[in-house]
Amino acid sequence: MLYLVLSKLVWIVLLAIVLILCVAYLTYAERKVIAATQLRVGPDLVGPFGLLQPIADAIKVLLKEIIIPNAASPKLFLFAPVIIFVLALVGWAVIPFGTSEIDGVEVPTVIANVNLGVMYLLGVAALEVYGTIIAGWASKSSYSFLGALRSASQMISYEIVIAPVVMTVILLTGSLNLAEIVVIKHSLPYWVDILMLPMTFIFFVSILAETNRHPFDLPEAEAELVSGYNVEYSSIPFALFFLGEYANMILSSSIMATLFLGGWYPPINWWGLSIVPGFIWFILKIVFVLFCFLIVRATLPRYRYDQLMRLCWKVFLPVTLLWIVVIGGLVAFNIV
C-alpha cells in the first residue's frame, strides 16, 4: 500500500515538472510559429536558436515585485491564480498515456483509472470559472471585472456545447472511463470516425473558447480591456495565470487526443506504425492539436463578442443536439 502511494506521488511530481517545462517551451514554439507566418525569425538571441528564451522570461517575471492594489481583497487576490493553476494540473489525474503489461495483463498507464473520468474532467473544467471570477472581483478594477464577466459567460456557454459533444462519444462507447473509451472507439469501423468529424471540429473550436485562446480571447482584448481579468497582477501570481492558461491548452489537447483522435493507437492500422510505442503516438497527437492552436492564433482575426455567442447558441448547440439523436439512433438500432 505504501509503495503504491509513493509511486503515485512520484508520478504526480514528475508530471507537474514535465508539464511546467512543456508550458515554457510551448510559449517558445508559439512565438516561433507566429514569427514564421509573418516572415520573421522570432526569439534567437538567448541560447542556441533562442532555446533559453523561456528560462530568461521566467527569471524576469519571478524577479518582479508582487503588487497588490490598495482596494483589492488580498487573500482572494492571491488565491485566484492558485485555483487556476492547480485545476490545470489536477485534470491530468485521469488522462491515460498508453498501456503497460503487468503480470501478462495490459493496464492503462494513468495516475487514477476511475470509471467516471469524463465526469471528473467536466467538473474540473466547470471549476475553472471560479478562479477567473474571483480574480476579476478581488482586483476591484473595472477592466478586471469586465474581463472576468466576459470570460465566465464565454466559458459557461461553451461548456454547454462541450457536454453534448462528449455525450456522443459516451453513447458510441457506452463508458465514462477514458481508457475504455479509447479501446472501444478503436474497435469501431472507420466510417464512425468520419461521422464524428463535425463533433471533432466543434470540440476543437469549443476548447479554443474554453481556454480563452485566439480568436476567442475576448476576456483579454487589448484594445478594450487592456489585459482582462489579470490586468492588476504581476510577478508570481501573473506567472501562475500564464502557466494555467498554457497548461489548460495542453490538457484540452490531451482530452481531444483521447476522445476523438484514438488516444495511444496509431492513426492507421498498419503493422509498421504499431511498432512505435503508444505513448509516442499520444504525445504526437497532443503536439498536432497544439500546433492547430498556434496556427489559428497566427492566421485568424478576433471574433466580436456577439459573434462568439451566436456561434455557440445558434450554430453549435443545435448541431450537437441533432448529432446526439443521430448517434443515439445508430446505437439503438445496433448499426454501430
UniProtKB/Swiss-Prot annotation:
GO terms for cellular component: plasma membrane. It is an enzyme of class 7 (translocase). Keywords: Cell inner membrane, Cell membrane, Membrane, NAD, Quinone, Translocase, Transmembrane, Transmembrane helix, Ubiquinone. The chain crosses the membrane at residues 9-29, 77-97, 116-136, 156-176, 188-208, 236-256, 275-295, 315-335. InterPro entries: NADH_UbQ_OxRdtase_su1/FPO, NADH_UbQ_OxRdtase_su1_CS. GO terms for biological process: aerobic respiration. HAMAP family: NDH1_NuoH. This is NADH-quinone oxidoreductase subunit H. The lineage of its organism: Bacteria, Pseudomonadati, Pseudomonadota, Alphaproteobacteria, Rickettsiales. The gene is nuoH.
